[in-house]
Amino acid sequence: MSGISLTSIDALIAEKHLLKHPFYRAWQDGTLTSEALRDYAAQYYRHVSAFPTYISALHSRCEDLETRQALLANLRDEEEGPENHPALWRRFAEAVGCSASEIDAGDVQPETAGAIAAFRAAVAEGPVVRGLAALYA
């Protein structure tokens, strides 16, 4: 990656750290409304449930065995067993008051659809390292 270190990538990511976003600050401060949390939980479930497909797409394009094995281990963490990530997120969404229909069939906000499309493009098109960076960040 011509002079770019993992440390420098981590520093770039830290500038945009998730917990710096106003939504997460409101959540941390206890000022986030229950309605906003429910909407977030239902929307984010779409991304969490799609995440294993991002890994699968990247795994299928990767030629490096060691990297493929790491992706496979991550995919197992995402999907295997009853404590898989989509199931855990679903339980969280239900715990904050989302109904099954809100989680599964509710309207997908344009921002959510855009994020999912961006991840799908990052892992399916261009260099594999681009997809790895998207999953890492």
Per-range role (PLM):
Residues 4, 69-137:
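Active-site-proximal alpha-helical scaffolds that flank and shape metal-associated catalytic sites
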